[in-house]
């Protein structure tokens, strides 16, 4: 199948969904960008740009905004879901009666669904063993939209879908590397947001560069423990979806999770920090999901547990750091 002949639907018109839509449309592909907010769609249709979430990057002629989910999926084989993880299951449920046996599902969502479920498990439960794929890696939406060099991982349960999707996306400035570890890619994408909040808190408390480096490194260890328990591959940890995305999210202030942590470390109230950022903060939601998973399987994840206590038990960030520093020394 020649993938470029068929339109692709992108469900989710936030900054990341829009950036991916631009990558595809700039290659001449027909792209349908769906948002559930009718006023947002009206704005995009009238202005030819997503001024709410990704301003300054005009839509190519082949990129159209939709609010009607049925219309956005009509005649479409490939669907790319880019909504916050807490909305992922709902979107799958809504699209279920609107798709057919030829449908192939990919997502750029990073996180776990309600009940600490991996996103591919949600898709399999609702839709069966359809061709599915995950796109992940260090990819700030504004830099992708600006056509700055970016590299991501793509993993799929279907070799033809993987080949077609890579052909759709890959270019000189947006490089796509094939990966065969869906579990590892999904778990890395979930944990890195939590660790970005942790490093943001540390920097907000002015604990220094040494502390930031230690948090990233020990955070990678936590990530590895989780991936190992669920059968993911250790190689994924040092790849784009693991270390690559972790370093970017923990160190760049374009990261919403890092900015959220910075605000908390500087003493800003949680709700106020959320309102200031104005878009979904995946780590805020996924801390709860990953924490539950770690508890259930007795996985040692002290950084994740302390972030959870800060977010959900009102633990003072300074106290959380002090408790981590008082932990008994152990082998690396």
Curated annotation (Swiss-Prot):
The gene is gpsA. It comes from Coxiella burnetii (strain CbuK_Q154) (Coxiella burnetii (strain Q154)). It is found in: Cytoplasm. Pathway: Membrane lipid metabolism; glycerophospholipid metabolism. It catalyses: sn-glycerol 3-phosphate + NAD(+) = dihydroxyacetone phosphate + NADH + H(+); sn-glycerol 3-phosphate + NADP(+) = dihydroxyacetone phosphate + NADPH + H(+). SUPFAM superfamilies: 6-phosphogluconate dehydrogenase C-terminal domain-like, NAD(P)-binding Rossmann-fold domains. Its main location: cytoplasm. PROSITE patterns: NAD_G3PDH (PS00957). Keywords: Cytoplasm, Lipid biosynthesis, Lipid metabolism, NAD, NADP, Nucleotide-binding, Oxidoreductase, Phospholipid biosynthesis, Phospholipid metabolism. Sn-glycerol 3-phosphate binds at residues 110, 137, 139, 192, 245, 255-257. This is Glycerol-3-phosphate dehydrogenase [NAD(P)+]. Pfam families: NAD_Gly3P_dh_C, NAD_Gly3P_dh_N. One of its GO terms (molecular function) is glycerol-3-phosphate dehydrogenase [NAD(P)+] activity. Its EC number is 1.1.1.94. InterPro entries: 6-PGluconate_DH-like_C_sf, 6PGD_dom2, G3P_DH_NAD-dep, G3P_DH_NAD-dep_C, G3P_DH_NAD-dep_N, NAD(P)-bd_dom_sf. GO terms for biological process: carbohydrate metabolic process; glycerol-3-phosphate biosynthetic process; glycerol-3-phosphate catabolic process; glycerophospholipid biosynthetic process. The keyword Lipid metabolism applies. Belongs to the NAD-dependent glycerol-3-phosphate dehydrogenase family. GO terms for cellular component: cytosol. It is an enzyme of class 1 (oxidoreductase).
């Amino acid at each position: 199948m020649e993938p470029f002949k068929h339109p692709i639907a992108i469900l989710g018109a936030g900054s990341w969904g829009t950036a991916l839509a631009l990558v595809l449309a700039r290659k001449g592909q027909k792209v349908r960008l769906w948002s559930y907010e009718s006023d947002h769609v009206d704005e995009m249709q009238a202005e030819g740009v997503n001024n709410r979430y990704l301003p300054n990057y005009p839509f190519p002629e082949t990129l159209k905004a939709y609010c009607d989910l049925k219309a956005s999926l009509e005649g479409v084989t490939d669907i790319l879901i880019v909504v916050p993880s807490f909305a992922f299951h709902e979107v799958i449920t809504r699209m279920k009666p609107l798709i057919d046996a030829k449908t192939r599902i990919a997502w750029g969502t990073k996180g776990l669904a309600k009940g600490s479920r991996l996103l591919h498990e949600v898709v399999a439960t609702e839709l069966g063993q359809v061709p599915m794929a995950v796109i992940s890696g260090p990819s700030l939406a504004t830099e992708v939209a600006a056509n700055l060099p970016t590299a991501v991982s793509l993993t799929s349960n279907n070799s033809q879908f993987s080949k077609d999707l890579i052909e759709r996306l890959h270019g000189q400035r947006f490089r796509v590397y094939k990966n065969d570890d869906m579990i590892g890619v999904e778990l890395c994408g979930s944990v890195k947001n939590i660790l970005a909040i942790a490093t943001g808190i540390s920097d907000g408390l002015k604990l220094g560069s040494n502390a930031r480096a230690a948090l990233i490194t020990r955070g990678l260890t936590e990530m590895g423990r989780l991936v190992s328990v669920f059968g993911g591959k250790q190689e994924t940890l040092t790849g784009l979806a693991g270390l690559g995305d972790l370093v970017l999210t923990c160190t760049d202030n374009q990261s919403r999770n890092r900015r959220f942590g910075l605000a908390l470390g500087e003493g800003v109230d949680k709700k106020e920090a959320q309102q200031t950022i104005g878009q979904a903060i995946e780590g805020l939601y996924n801390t709860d999901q990953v924490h539950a998973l770690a508890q259930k399987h007795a996985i040692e994840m002290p950084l994740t547990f302390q972030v959870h206590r800060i977010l959900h038990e009102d633990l003072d960030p300074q106290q959380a750091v002090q408790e981590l520093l008082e932990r008994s020394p152990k082998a690396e």
